[in-house]
Amino acid sequence: MAMQSGFIKRIRDIMRMDAGINGDAQRIEQMVWMLFLKVYDAKEDDWELNEDNYESIIPEDLRWRNWAKADSNGHAMTGDKLLNFVNNTLFPVLKGNDVKEGDTIVYEGIKVAPDTPIKKAIVKSTFEDANNYMKDGVYLRQVIDVIDEIEFDDVKESHAFGFVYEEILRELQSAGSSGEFYTPRAVTEFMALMIKPKLGEKMADFACGTGGFITSWLGQLSKQVTDTSAQKQLDDSIYGIEKKPFPYLLCVTNMLLHDIEATNIYHMNSLKHNLLDYTDADKFDVILMNPPYGGHEDKSIQGFFPDDLASSETADLFMSVILYRLKKNGRAAVVVPDGFLFGLDNAKVNIKKKLIGEFNLHTVVRLPSSVFSPYTSITTNLLFFDNTKPTTETWFYRVDIPSDRKHFSKTKPMELKHFDDCIAWWNNREVIPDGEYFKSQKFTADYLLNEQGCNIDLCGYPHEEEEVLDPLDTIREYQERRTSLNAEIDKVLAELEALLPGGVIK
C-alpha cells in the first residue's frame, strides 16, 4: 500500500525539477515508456525460463537489465552519458533505426517481419512515436531508480502495482486532451458485467485507448478460468486497435501488467478500411467500446464509407464499423454522446435505421453529464444491442446522480455501486414514472423510427444539471442540435408541401 501512495508522488517530485517536462501529459508519457521496458524485461525473464532458445528482439546491451540497473560495483549510468545513451542509442534502435559510428553500424535497429511474434513486434510499435522529454540525466537516473524498485516477479507487488497503474490512467482525465483516452472504470466494469462474457468468445475495441474495456472484459472472463487451456482462451479473447501512439503505449503496458503476453493490440486507424470489404473473418462475438466523438479525421476517411453512412463525426463512423463487424448473434455495448440520440442528419438517421431495423437495440442507459468530468461534460449514453433480429422494442433507463451529490468529479468519481439500481432493474424490467417524466420506459421500434423520426432522445433528465459545459463542448452540442432542428424542419416542410395541390412552394 505504501508503494501505491508513494510511487507516483516520488516520480512527480523528481520530474518537476526537470526543465524538459511540460505538464502532466508529458510526465505520464515519460513515466510509461520506462515502465514498459521494466515490465517487458520481467516478462522476458519468464519467456527465457519457459521457452527453448528464446531470443530478445532488443539488443543485449539495450535490455533494461543491462543499462538501467547498477553494475556489480554499484555503478550506474547517469548524467550526460545516460541522456546521450537514451536519446542517441536506445530510442533510435527501438524505433527501428541503425546507430552508426562513422560508417560502422554499432547497433542495428530492431526489425519486424510479418512472422515476428506479436510479443516481440510490440516493442517497435510501442516506441515508434515515443519521446524522451527529460533534459537532465541525473533526474532521469533518479526516476529510473524509483521504477526499478518494483519487483514484477513478486506476485503480490505486481498485483499492487496494478492499482498504481490505474491511478496513472485516472490522472489522464485531468491531463489536457489525453483525457479522451480514459473511460471511467465504473462505466467499463458495468458494460462488461452486463455483456456477460463467455470463454471462447472474441471481444474487440476498435478505439481501445488505454485498454479500459479490455481490462474489464478480462476481469469478468478470468472468473471462468480453471486450467491452462482456459487461460489460453482468455489470452486469445481480445482484439484492440488504437490510432494514437501515447494511448497505444499505455494499453500495451496495461496488457503486460495483466499477464496478457501475445497481446492483439494494433497501432493503426480502424476507420482506414473500406466498410463494405469486411468479411465474416473480420467480425467479433462481442464489441465493447467508447468511440471518440468530436474527433478530427482527414476528409478522405469518409471515402471508406458508403455515401449514406459517410459523416464528419467520428462517433458515427465508428458506429458503422461496429455494425459491420459484429458477428451474427454477437453482442455489443457502446458509449455514444447525446448528439447520436437526437441527431437527424443524413448519416445518423441511416445508422439508426440500420441499428434498429437490422439489430436488436434492447437497452439504452442514460448517464449523468458529469460521469466523464473533468474531461467533458457532454452527456453520454450506453447502447446495448445484439445481432440476433431486428428491434421490436427498446427499454430506456436513466441513471440519476446520488441524492447526496450535485455531480461526479475527479475526487468523487462515479463508482460501480452507482449502477446498483440499474442492475436490479435490468433483471426485472418495469416502467418507472418520475412525475411528468419517466426514469424508465419502453418504446416500440415503429415508434422510434416513424413517430420519433429516429430521434431517440427519450427518458432524459428533467432538469438541467448544475454543470457548466466547456466552451468547445457547448459549441459542439449546439451544432448538433442545430443540425437536428434543421433536419426536423426540412422533414415537416416536405410533409406540408406534399399536401399542397401544386406540390412544392416556389
Model regions and ranges:
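Non-catalytic, mostly N-terminal accessory regions of nucleic-acid modification and defense proteins
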Residues: 1-194, 198-199, 266-273, 366-370, ...
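Helical mechanochemical/support elements of P-loop NTPase systems and associated helical scaffolds
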Residues: 7, 24-27, 139, 160, ...
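Charged, amphipathic alpha-helical interaction segments
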Residues: 35, 222, 256-259, 327, ...
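A short, mixed-charge helix-start or loop-turn motif at secondary-structure junctions
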Residues: 173-174, 234, 304-305
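Conserved S-adenosyl-L-methionine
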Residues: 177-289, 294-296, 312, 316, ...
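A conserved structural/catalytic subdomain of Rossmann-like adenosyl-cofactor enzymes
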Residues: 267, 278-506
